């Protein structure tokens, strides 16, 4: 059985997230998704996610391609990958915490050598990113309750 792992913030789900996860699932039999912790997102992006981590995890796990969604580690971002021992890791188009080669080198230290695949497709549709959704909400409802 081929285990695939994908990770992300998944703050305000949109079609791009779904296409990313559908692609990831197509590469194997089991898809486990690591959802970034609120504190991790705040450290990387300089702001907390809009949707709390447990709600984001539950929403991701409810998606058809996803077999299981877990929260990432607060200590070591590689910890869940080390525990899961995936055959394939799928990176999203905007994931830059690691590049493919750096990730391979880091995982080699733990005797892991999964195939690393980058999903480079941006979905061309209205509201294809969380940022675009937030901008539209502010435009439509900015200052209004």
From Swiss-Prot:
Name listed for the protein in its UniProt record: FAD synthase
NCBIfam families for this protein: cyt_tran_rel (TIGR00125)
The protein's annotated pathway: Cofactor biosynthesis; FAD biosynthesis; FAD from FMN: step 1/1
Catalytic activity from the UniProt record: FMN + ATP + H(+) = FAD + diphosphate
Top-level EC class: transferase
Cofactor entry: a divalent metal cation
Amino acids binding ATP: 9-10, 14-17, 94, 122
InterPro entries the UniProt entry points to: Archaeal_FAD_synthase (IPR050385), Cyt_trans-like (IPR004821), FAD_synth_RibL (IPR024902), Rossmann-like_a/b/a_fold (IPR014729)
EC number: 2.7.7.2
Molecular functions per Gene Ontology: ATP binding; FMN adenylyltransferase activity
Transmembrane segments: none
SUBUNIT field: Homodimer.
Family: Belongs to the archaeal FAD synthase family.
Keyword Nucleotide-binding: yes
Organism: Methanocaldococcus infernus (strain DSM 11812 / JCM 15783 / ME)
Gene3D superfamilies: HUPs
GO biological process, one term: FMN metabolic process
Keywords (A to Z) from UniProt: ATP-binding, FAD, Flavoprotein, FMN, Nucleotide-binding, Nucleotidyltransferase, Transferase
């Amino acid at each position: 059985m081929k285990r695939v792992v994908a990770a992300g913030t998944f703050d305000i789900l949109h079609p791009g997230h779904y296409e990313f996860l559908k692609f990831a699932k197509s590469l194997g039999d089991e898809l486990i998704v690591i959802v970034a912790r609120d504190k991790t997102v705040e450290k990387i992006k300089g702001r907390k996610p809009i949707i709390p981590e447990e709600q984001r995890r539950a929403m991701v796990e409810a998606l058809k391609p996803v077999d299981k969604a877990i929260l990432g580690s607060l200590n070591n971002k590689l910890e869940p990958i080390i525990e899961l021992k995936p055959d394939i890791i799928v990176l999203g188009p905007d994931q830059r915490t690691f590049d493919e080669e750096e990730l391979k080198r880091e995982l080699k230290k733990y005797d892991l050598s999964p195939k690393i695949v980058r999903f480079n497709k941006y979905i061309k549709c209205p509201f294809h990113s969380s940022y675009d959704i937030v901008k539209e909400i502010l435009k439509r409802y900015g200052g209004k309750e």
